Amino acid sequence: MATSTTLQSLLMKEDEEQRNKRRTTSTMFLKKDDEERINWVDLPPELTTSILLRLSVTDILDNARKLCRAWRRICKDPSMWRKINLRDCLMYEFDFESMCRHIVDLSQGGLLEINIEHFVSDSLLSYIVDRSCNLKSLGISIYEPMTNKGVMNGIEKLPLLETLVIFHSSIKLDLKAIGHACPQLKTLKLNSLGSELAHDISQVGYIPLLECDDDALAIAESMPKLRHLQLMGNGLTNTGLNAILDGCPHLEEHLDVRKCFNINLVGNLEKRCMKRIKELRRPHDSTADYPYSISVSMVVQMMITSRYH
């Protein structure tokens, strides 16, 4: 019922926008009983497509495409499946991996953006990248049973990738290899903290990260086209941050180093960042707007594991 209401609301809104364009300057007062009933099936295909693209993936697959033949035909068009957001799909009861594979098949090789926040297996990632050579934006979370090898094998097949968002636990990624495999990379988000801990770190006590500039140096050496960088909960120091600023000359739009408590953003480094970066998020800035969440226990385990591996 909620899905039908959402669909009807979008349809009515789109139709109203179109009718407003055709109205003359004369004011017309029509009684509700006299208004023409809209035949949604007869809407122009481009208008129907515009409406459908505003729906969630599950709304399209479970409802919209079943309404009529015309809509089913539009829903099968590869252009409907260029940009896919699957972040909120876990609230539904279905075979998530099968649905992802079906969406990739519907795109017919034209998938450009996909965002999957939870539970991607090595085999699913491989299925996506093997059939989406033009992919420009990938957002995934890395939990078991994903493996380092599976993640690296997948990402290294995406030479046109411009945006990479990764949420990982104890997996150590070879960022230098990723940078060389994805030379067009402009946005990197590598986050090591979930919002539950970020909002209230006092729940588990402060667990300092070991100083480690490996990620920072790898980024500096292999990602010269970066414009947006987010490293949350990373162990980099001032040395690593300076290396990034040196190696990424186009990094001017956005730099987010919240929860990177080994950075002391003062003096010349602070001046350098303030002068160059349009949007700077500091280590102690609020994370209230952080949209992703993993459990506190997972983050604590990640921090402990990182100390011994």
UniProtKB/Swiss-Prot annotation:
Chain segments carrying region Disordered: 1-26
Domain F-box, chain residue ranges per copy: 37-84
Organism from which the protein derives: Arabidopsis thaliana (Mouse-ear cress)
Protein name: Putative F-box protein At4g05475
Signal peptide range in chain numbering: none
Pfam families to which the protein is assigned, alphabetical: F-box-like
Matching InterPro entries: F-box-like_dom_sf, F-box_dom, LRR_dom_sf
